[in-house]
């Protein structure tokens, strides 16, 4: 609802009388050129930007400088239509949706989101604040590049939003927006019924009783929120201590929380003359709503005031957050918007207040991750995406809520006893009693299921960096990709299969499960663990090395090693050490793990492990050190013969520094080592002498055989004769069994 406005026409460069002559005499108006520069918030504070003081109050320039303008995000508006001919609401981005169906009385309807005779300027003004173009003329909206879909209430702003609006019509209108793919719907439409008051909780219960147990338009709005859409509702302009029933609906239907946003309003002096957040504080923020300049039918602009003007600031800000975090769902994006808001003095909100809820959106803070985790929060970053959250992340609001829920539960138990409702409502209960009972039971059940600690789950193959100092109390799970902690976490971290923990920060504890990897540092660095750590069988501790440094884990508690592997790689390399890299590091020692509480257990292996070179671990009481050099494989273990084994044993005694020993250590495989042993054994020399002596008889025996053939008369008469004999042979050195040398030979 709007409480006042002033109008001014859209400025034009040419008067109507001179339009044709001026067009002939002057060149065409140049296309708008954006002066805003990436990384420079001040460059975005153009004259157009300054026409809406709400942009500066929410620090929208910080989002624009980060490249965030709402592009690609679909948002909706439920209001009194809009003027599609306004230059700032172009058809390329503003699209009306059509609500079609049959009213409760059987009359058919088909109503477009474009203005009709039943409408007023309200919807056009609200729509401009949502997303009017940034084109150098007039003003621009918060999410000036978003796609805006508009449904029509088919009424004006005086339309009362009590229980009487036709539920069939609103179901069709809300569903048309949801079917268009909008992620949030702005609801600034209508006025408060005169027969209700939101000043007290009893008054709110009475107002909600008008809707309870019957089909009303509120069911239509709630229906699309249960499909995942965020409904944004203005809180109302009457100055009550609480937001209206419609903006406070999750109080009565707790399952809607997370998909509902109530919005109160401020003036330029931080005054709040409108309905405060009250019972809606956990899903309520407060945005600029006084003297807001925006679009008007006919191409002009005007100032209007009220929470109707505040709500689209919040919806536009939510669209920017949605663009900033494409991997978050709607509820998560809303949580970022809420938890990065600030109180009126600019301080971050620890817990929402009855007056302003979470406070004023701070789009500068909202660009740097959530400010709090309000339960389990899963960040599912796809492969190839890397993001950084630099905000300190707490869960302090949950402490306040836990105390309030406990007090409310105790009060509800007293109510059940005092009213005799412990076994349910009596027959003949009034409408108000049925309403109160349903509200109390729903809220008590929701509180029983609520989580009062924030927790983070890193999922997906992408990478997330936490660089703030975070104090949320629940666990941190790494279920996929990389979570790099460069700030600090009070939370303990559990690394599951497919996940990797990195960073050079500090965490509360560490558990690496089978398939999980811990890779301390970003490149080479140290990860601190304030408590205990444990590596389970099948886990991996991935250590990067340079000539002078390595990754390291330093724990204040105990280290329990139940197996797993230590893998070695050069700094900034994804691959395990090559043999030549191992050779380059031979003789170096690295501290890779320290635990003040002691070390229990052993890793299974160090990889890579080449034939005679690799890494070995030295376990001390409170430290594990890595030595690069000779591994545990004996030279003789790859020998094929006793002679080779004898040579290998002799070389082993030479030790480091001897060129023969050092050369053998560089053998790439067993065959290479065996050839070296054979050459060093000298076996070939006596075997060769015997072989040559034995082979000399073959020529002698062949000549003798021919002579015997002649004496036996086998040769022919006087004719010339030829004679030849082919010889073939093979031979090899004997196996040298029992230390003897020899050979085997055969002639064919």
Q: For each predicted feature, which ranges?
A:
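Gram-negative bacterial Sec-dependent N-terminal signal peptides
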Residues: 1-30
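Subtilisin-like serine protease catalytic core
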Residues: 32-41, 50-51, 61-166, 180, ...
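C-terminal subdomain of the subtilisin-like protease fold in secreted/lumenal serine endopeptidases
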Residues: 51-52, 59, 184-186, 259-262, ...
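Extracellular beta-solenoid/beta-roll
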Residues: 453, 466, 474-549, 554-563, ...
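Outer membrane beta-barrel translocator domains of Type V secretion systems
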Residues: 657-748
